[in-house]
A protein has these predicted regions:
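Active-site mouth loops of central-metabolism enzymes
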Residues: 7-18, 85-100, 180-193, 251-259
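Glycine-rich, aromatic-flanked loop segments that form ligand/cofactor-binding clefts
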Residues: 55-80, 98-124, 144, 152-168
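Second-shell residues forming the walls of enzyme active-site clefts
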Residues: 39-57, 73, 149-316
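A short C-terminal boundary segment appended to hydrolase-like catalytic domains
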Residues: 300, 308-336
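N-terminal hydrophobic targeting/anchoring segments and the immediately downstream early-domain regions
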Residues: 1-63, 71-79, 334-336
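Short, acidic/polar
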Residues: 13-27, 97-108, 193-199, 259-267
Length: 336
């Protein structure tokens, strides 16, 4: 039976409010999510209003943001400036602090009407990749898994599902996949012994995984996000992962190896992604939409698992747990 693709595209909008063109795009059944960026954000109340406007058009849309801490946090004015995750490792109570960071982040994101942040980063810090760097918890895979697991516990306790990225690990490749096509020349055995460890340890805690736009030529000629070898054989098969697979942004240079936006969304979904992100390029999003409309795939039921499990009160700063969590980070001199 032929089934029209529904809900397998995540797109974005240009401003702090919706245009008629935005509303038309969001009404397309193939669009299943929207990610917001810094350009869409002024302050918490405005983000809540934008979220409400989006849900008035499509109540079922998954609303996302990148709110990791450190240099990657889109929600800034009126929000806690969380530390880079690498800063936690030096503290004797790093695991406790990681859990508080996860809870604070998720609480603030949920309070403005969003469903999830694409976090945590499970890449290892080899001090080779500038694009990863301090976004990683650690260079040691077991320690990274412990700290990321604590961060996930905090997210989950606030009501948010976790997304581990960037599978199978972006930390060794030096090039930035936003502007280039990185290569990691290591063997599968080397990657399995190191970078895959956090993904393997946390496979049951992760609701989603986001693959890297990195080519691992000793494993497959395609970037991981377009590779059935990585997504089906290793992630689904070897690691027994049954959560959502989100592509990374298909507008990034690291994704261009497979062609135009139509080719990219087709390649990502065919390889095993449940949802493809097409951001910062409306023409590319429309091209991907056209491709999605002509594809014959079964919509993924997994995506519904990513919706917010709780709605944080706008008065969350009066919650004793908030005061305790923020106080712990201040005492550790991780936030102001």
């Amino acid at each position: 039976m032929t089934v029209a693709l529904q809900g397998s595209l995540m797109v974005d909008v240009a401003g702090t409010w919706l245009t008629a063109e935005d509303r038309h795009l969001l009404r397309q059944p193939e669009v299943g999510g929207l990610i917001i960026f810094a350009r869409n954000i002024e302050h918490p109340r405005q983000v809540r209003e934008l979220s409400a406007a989006i849900r008035a058009v499509r109540p079922d849309l998954l609303l996302a943001v990148d709110q990791e801490g450190g240099r990657v946090q889109r929600l800034r004015q009126g929000f806690v400036r969380l530390p880079a995750m690498r800063a936690l490792a030096a503290h004797p109570n790093a695991e406790y602090l990681a859990e508080q960071c996860g809870w604070i982040m998720a609480t603030e994101v949920l309070a403005v009407g969003l469903d999830l942040s694409f976090a945590p980063v499970l890449d290892l810090d080899y001090q080779r990749s500038a694009v990863v760097g301090t976004r990683a918890f650690e260079g040691d895979p077991e320690r990274a898994a412990v700290l990321a697991g604590a961060f996930i516990r905090g997210m989950n306790s606030a009501g948010m599902a976790a997304t581990g990225k960037h599978f199978p690990g972006h930390g060794w490749a030096e090039a930035d996949s936003h502007v280039a096509i990185p290569n990691d020349e290591r063997s599968l055995e080397q990657i399995r012994a190191n970078d895959l460890v956090p993904f393997a340890r946390l496979s049951k805690q992760l609701a989603a995984v986001m693959p890297a736009h990195v080519i691992y030529p000793q494993v497959d000629a395609q970037p991981a996000g377009f590779s059935r070898r990585w997504l089906q054989d290793i992630l689904r098969g070897e690691l027994q992962f049954d959560g959502v697979i989100f592509s990374d942004d298909l507008s990034m240079a690291g994704a261009h190896v497979v062609g135009d936006a139509a080719s990219r969304i087709e390649a990502a979904l065919t390889a095993g992604c449940d949802m493809g992100l097409v951001c910062n390029d409306r023409a590319a999003a429309e091209l991907a939409l056209t491709a999605a409309q002509r594809m014959k795939v079964t919509p993924s039921a997994r995506i519904a698992r990513m919706r917010a499990q709780a709605k944080a009160s706008t008065d969350y700063k009066q919650d004793p747990r908030w005061m305790l969590a923020v106080g712990a980070l201040r005492d550790a001199q991780l936030i102001e």
